[in-house]
Amino acid sequence: KEGYIVNYHDGCKYECYKLGDNDYCLRECRLRYGKGAGGYCYAFGCWCTHLYEQAVVWPLKNKTCN
């Protein structure tokens, strides 16, 4: 599974500005989903890869980013 890492409180994606390989996104994806996860910056959001099927990613149901 793949997807954008999401802030559970406001429903927003984690933003990033350095597209492609991005240490911040990789670190945040691994903190949330485990050391087997990958991450990079895609369309100014942190995109996480190699996730388990039940991983919660953006968008959250009933929560819109404001």
Swiss-Prot record:
Q: Does the keyword GTP-binding apply?
A: no
Tell me where it mainly resides. secreted
- The answer to whether keyword Protein transport applies is no
Might you report a single GO cellular component term?
Answer: extracellular region
* SUPFAM superfamilies for the chain: Scorpion toxin-like
What compartments host this protein?
Answer: Secreted
Alphabetized GO MF terms: sodium channel inhibitor activity; toxin activity
Any idea where the LCN-type CS-alpha/beta domain is?
1-66
The intrachain disulfides are C12-C65, C16-C41, C25-C46, C29-C48
This protein's UniProt keywords: Amidation, Disulfide bond, Ion channel impairing toxin, Neurotoxin, Secreted, Toxin, Voltage-gated sodium channel impairing toxin
Q: Name one GO biological process term.
A: defense response
What does UniProt note about where in the body, tissue by tissue, this protein is expressed?
Expressed by the venom gland.
List of residues that carry Asparagine amide: N66
Tell me the protein family, please.
Answer: Belongs to the long (4 C-C) scorpion toxin superfamily. Sodium channel inhibitor family. Beta subfamily.
Please quote what the entry notes about the protein's domains. Has the structural arrangement of an alpha-helix connected to antiparallel beta-sheets by disulfide bonds (CS-alpha/beta).
State what this protein does.
Beta toxins bind voltage-independently at site-4 of sodium channels (Nav) and shift the voltage of activation toward more negative potentials thereby affecting sodium channel activation and promoting spontaneous and repetitive firing. Acts on human sodium channel Nav1.6/SCN8A and with less activity on Nav1.5/SCN5A.
What other facts are recorded?
A: Is neutralized by the single-chain antibody variable fragment HV. Abundance in venom is approximately 5.7%.
Please report the name of this protein according to its UniProt entry: Beta-toxin Chui5
Q: Recall the taxonomic lineage recorded for the source organism.
A: Eukaryota, Metazoa, Ecdysozoa, Arthropoda, Chelicerata
